[in-house]
Design a protein with these regions (language model features):
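N-terminal strand-loop element at the rim of the active site
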Residues: 6-14, 18-68, 141-144
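A conserved mid-protein helix/loop that constitutes part of the nucleotide-sugar donor-binding site
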Residues: 14-25, 169, 173-192, 205-211
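Acidic anion/phosphate-binding donor-loop and adjacent secondary structure
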Residues: 67, 133, 148-168, 230
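Donor nucleotide-sugar binding/catalytic pocket of nucleotide-sugar-dependent glycosyltransferases
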Residues: 56, 119-156
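Short His-centered aromatic/hydrophobic patch
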Residues: 64-68, 85-92, 106
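Short hydrophobic beta-strand element within catalytic cores of glycosyltransferases
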Residues: 37-38, 264-267, 286
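Aromatic "clamp/platform" in nucleotide-sugar-dependent glycosyltransferases that forms part
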Residues: 228, 247
Length: 286
């Protein structure tokens, strides 16, 4: 059997990190032999352990983190993988050369200087693959493999948990609280939707800014900041529509999640949603 090693630094929360976990669990269920090297994360480690996946936690620090580099090489030498799959810049750039196929997965338009030692690159949208080709990456060594989401239907929760009345329109938006996600635009739009409530599930550096904005324009009582959640399917199942307002969104996993939960999806026409959604047929683009 092909032996796989996956390496990811990653943040505690994020779309790439969620998909990594989803893929690792899926590969394990399919019988793939694998081990994981990852940055310390209690919840992610628990999920992998419960599935029977061996993982080691490393610091994945900046340039002078010599221990992580040494440890990765030692694990590779002992495990002798056939394929190393690395995720994003930090993990990819410190994978040593060796007698294995090094594949990196990109979920954005990353600087390819971190990927010079890779044998193959995977983009999760055709647009990212086009970017790789335009950056002179060999055509036969860049590949399109889309993301997937779990197809389990969620169970609606009691709206009262988040002080939201029954019988009013309820929309949801999910993701890291970053300027690229344009949650500020969505919150401003709430001023025009007098009876609508918004559940905003995510965490990040823009939390205080977005909270202040909601207070300033008088919608704070109708905008509920839920923090980062692991029960997104249940949250989406509770709401009337899912909104993806991102200024920059290479893919948009939340669009896929909204479809699985059979909810209307409304999105700004950034790259990912524009690729996924056929306006007026399986969603709305603005």
């Amino acid at each position: 059997m092909v032996k796989l090693l996956q390496a990811i630094a990653g943040a505690p929360h994020g779309g790439a990190e969620l998909f990594f976990t989803r893929l690792a669990l899926g590969l394990e269920e399919a019988g793939q032999q694998q081990i994981i090297l990852m940055r310390k994360d209690k919840e992610r480690a628990r999920l992998l352990k419960d599935a029977g996946i061996y993982s080691e936690e490393l610091r994945f620090g900046a340039g002078f983190d010599f221990f992580t580099r040494w440890k990765i090489k030692r694990v590779i030498d002992a495990y002798k993988p056939d394929i190393v799959l690395s995720w994003m810049n930090r993990a990819t750039q410190i994978i040593p050369m060796g007698p294995f196929v090094h594949v990196a997965r990109l979920g954005g338009y990353y600087n390819l200087k971190y990927y010079k030692n890779c044998d193959h690159l995977i983009g999760n949208t055709p647009q990212i693959v086009d970017y790789l080709k335009q950056s002179n990456w060999p055509v036969g060594k860049c590949h399109y493999i889309p993301n997937f989401v779990n197809d389990e239907l969620g169970l609606p929760i009691d709206r009262a948990v988040f002080n939201t009345p029954d019988g009013v329109p309820l929309i949801i938006s999910l993701g890291r609280l970053h300027k690229n996600k344009a949650f500020d635009v969505l919150i401003k739009a709430m001023a025009e939707l007098n009876d609508t409530f918004l559940w905003l599930a995510g965490d990040g550096e823009e939390l205080s800014t977005l909270t202040s904005l909601a207070e300033e324009i008088g919608v704070r009582e109708r905008v509920k900041f839920l923090g980062w959640r692991s029960d997104t399917k249940n949250l989406i199942a509770t709401c009337d529509a899912l909104i993806c307002p991102s200024r920059h969104e290479p893919l948009g996993n939340v669009v896929l999640e909204g479809w699985v939960q059979r909810k209307p999806v409304i999105a700004a026409a950034s790259d990912g949603p524009r690729y996924l959604i056929e306006h007026g047929k399986n969603g709305l683009l603005s």
